[in-house]
Amino acid sequence: MSGSAGSGGTTGSARKRIMKEEDMTKVEFETSEEVDVTPTFDTMGLREDLLRGIYAYGFEKPSAIQQRAIKQIIKGRDVIAQSQSGTGKTATFSISVLQCLDIQVRETQALILAPTRELAVQIQKGLLALGDYMNVQCHACIGGTNVGEDIRKLDYGQHVVAGTPGRVFDMIRRRSLRTRAIKMLVLDEADEMLNKGFKEQIYDVYRYLPPATQVVLISATLPHEILEMTNKFMTDPIRILVKRDELTLEGIKQFFVAVEREEWKFDTLCDLYDTLTITQAVIFCNTKRKVDWLTEKMREANFTVSSMHGDMPQKERESIMKEFRSGASRVLISTDVWARGLDVPQVSLIINYDLPNNRELYIHRIGRSGRYGRKGVAINFVKNDDIRILRDIEQYYSTQIDEMPMNVADLI
């Protein structure tokens, strides 16, 4: 490898290639040259019992990110993978983690950090499902749950721990989570974690890991501050990145409804309710207060909705998610806590009651309404003073958001 020819493993030729890009706002880096494509799961050199789990789970053919990243991770390389929601990124690292385990050794060999409790639990469930024939032990280590239970589970021995950085670090500090056998650290939704809140805690966790630990970082967006951070704890990483303007929104029809004033949004939503319940819909608000207010108001008007935000107790959030997943509730009102990585395939309509506070969140909200290339519809409620933000989002993603047609129900 010629990784020494530049900072953080960017080779000279790669750096020249980056400089050639005229518009740096559109493009981060390109995929490393040595990344080849493995078109089927059968040709990845995976263990038999894992392959059985993959096919039993319903996967047939690897997605683009899986075709590129799994082989590199299994080889032991540090990997930065840029991949939006709905591309199969969770399965990418889950399959790789399962392949690298020594099931005979009942110690933690892989650690996966995620920004929200829900996402950590979803990762854990995915690992248990994919590893169904391997007899894998996997625990979700998350805040808001019983510490004693965590300690008991960890003492029993877990091959993989998925969790939120705060609780994971707490367990390492208490010596309940032993790090000596850890071979791999996965940072999922890294942009969100390294944002503000979890940066310090990730560093704290990282300091306790064996020096040779392999690091895999997965993220929908890669702001430069993340790429700088990867230099600190990755060695000559392979980059598997796509140009930003190819990053999803494909197959998702995006519309806006002009509402002059905030008060008009509610009536607009009520008019749309019959359309919402054709399949399942998620409605995003920017604040917890707004979620509670809107839920209350919808129920007063005799509409059936459920709601979720970060202030709710863990148990309550879990039962709401379960209800929504099973289809028992059709409309979920939420803050951005829902926008990251939560997988409900039936959701084919997203409504931004409020436009997101930052444009990078837009893709996290919308990118899930058309999972795995399925079609979806996104409707943005836009007040007069939001037009500017909408245009900014359009430009940022090189996409088009048209006024909502009358026959929107036919598109869902």
UniProtKB/Swiss-Prot annotation:
InterPro entries: DEAD/DEAH_box_helicase_dom (IPR011545), Helicase_ATP-bd (IPR014001), Helicase_C-like (IPR001650), P-loop_NTPase (IPR027417), RNA-helicase_DEAD-box_CS (IPR000629), RNA_helicase_DEAD_Q_motif (IPR014014). Residues 1-11 have a biased composition (Gly residues). SMART domains: DEXDc, HELICc. A motif (DEAD box) lies at residues 188-191. It catalyses: ATP + H2O = ADP + phosphate + H(+). One of its GO terms (cellular component) is catalytic step 2 spliceosome. Residues 1-20 are annotated as: Disordered. It comes from the Eukaryota. Residues 70-240 form the Helicase ATP-binding domain. A motif (Q motif) lies at residues 39-67. ATP binds at residues 61, 66, 86-91, 343, 368-372. Keywords: ATP-binding, Cytoplasm, Helicase, Hydrolase, mRNA processing, mRNA splicing, mRNA transport, Nonsense-mediated mRNA decay, Nucleotide-binding, Nucleus, RNA-binding, Spliceosome, Translation regulation, Transport. Coiled coil: none annotated. Identified in the spliceosome C complex. Part of the mRNA splicing-dependent exon junction complex (EJC) complex; the core complex contains CASC3, EIF4A3, MAGOH and RBM8A. Component of the ALYREF/THOC4-EJC-RNA complex; in the complex interacts with MAGOH, RBM8A and THOC4 (via the WXHD motif); these interactions are likely specific to RNA-bound EJC. May interact with NOM1. Interacts with POLDIP3. Interacts with CWC22 and PRPF19 in an RNA-independent manner. Direct interaction with CWC22 is mediated by the helicase C-terminal domain. Belongs to the DEAD box helicase family. eIF4A subfamily. This is Eukaryotic initiation factor 4A-III. It comes from Gallus gallus.
